[in-house]
Curated annotation (Swiss-Prot):
Active site per database record: 168
Free-text function comment from the UniProt entry: Catalyzes the formation of pseudouridine at position 31 in the psi GC loop of tRNAS.
Entry keyword annotation includes Nuclease: no
Cell compartment(s), UniProt: Cytoplasm; Mitochondrion
Reactions catalysed: uridine(31) in tRNA = pseudouridine(31) in tRNA
Name listed for the protein in its UniProt record: tRNA pseudouridine(31) synthase
Biological processes annotated in GO: enzyme-directed rRNA pseudouridine synthesis; tRNA pseudouridine synthesis
Main location: cytoplasm
Similarity section: Belongs to the pseudouridine synthase RluA family.
Keywords (A to Z) from UniProt: Cytoplasm, Isomerase, Mitochondrion, tRNA processing
Gene that specifies this protein: PUS6
Amino acid sequence: MSTIKVIEVYTQNGLRKVRPYYNRRSAFVKGRWLGKLLIDVLVSEFKLRPRAYYLDQIRKGTYRLIRDGVPLVPDHLMTTIIKNHDVLETTTHKHEPPVKQWCSQEVEAEDLPGRIAGFNIVFEDESILVIDKPSGIPVHPTGQFYQNTITELLKLHGVDALPCYRLDKITSGLLILAKNSQSAGEIQKSIRSRDMIKIYLARVKGRFPHSELILDNENAAETTFEDTSKVTVEMTPIYSIDPKRQFPVGLSTSKDAITKFYPIRYFSHADETVVACKPITGRTHQIRIHLARLGHPIVNDSVYCSHITKYPERLKFITQFPRWENQQDLDAEELKVRFQKFVDETKNNCRTMETFCPECHTVDLKDPVLSDLELWLHAWKYEEINGKFKFKTDLPKWAQLDNS
């Protein structure tokens, strides 16, 4: 259970911000905690802070034990062991990162026909809501994000809906949300069984294969994948690298992946191509990685575009070793050394300030750069092969003929 005080939202420099707020959460204690002191549990379960920090927080009431509906006083917590049915109550000072402002606060507040919370509605009935997700905002609560997420914003406008699939924070486009668990299950089943045709758009570096055969007109996008001679297929495996986790857990197993690509238009002055992308499998960052391996990364991809990447060691590894398990020169020790490089470059990109929150002493984070909150990758079409539904958004501005 979670209790949140009224939050304050404001916009600044193109960002939607939430002022830090207090959040109180409560849950029954875990079985492995029984018979232990609260301070010992906190130190062993949450190792990021020293023992002295948790002692101070217990005295301040940040962590409390509720027994038979009555909170134990801090002094008693130092000597009282945890019992079955105790409830741990935690009060935290939440610092949410800002997200990209997608509309004015006035537009966000007033729902007009075809819009909710400032998001364009593609389709809505009693079972589902389909919106055109803007880039720069997470779909659902994750990590430090909670209030600044699409599902929580929709709740403020009377819609409690579940996302049917994942769209990254910086990706835009079609987002199908189910208003009940049955609808969510049906759509997710279609996706898992590959009964769903998904087409994304991306703007990439260079002249993509077969782009010399396309006609630059507004209708070019409507004929994607009709001419099989223009299709490029990338079939290299996909794995993820998570520097926040220790090696070897942070390096996932390679999994087979297939993406088909089709050029739509070529912008000669910029030497960039808009391509349609049809992922047959659904691996994390699959389209982005496959485009990078083809030598045509997404133009503004700060992870997988070699011209602007903030993570050159990670990018080099992913492009050089499509299936890292098969490389004889990558033994456990070499992998550990390389993984440490991934960790180091991630730390170097952490945008921290030299100031601390006066209430909770959390290190303040610098505002993100607006350009880092947008990726020229857009979920454009979703179609159920049995004809149950077919949804499509307008072309994003960067894919339009007059936005070259």
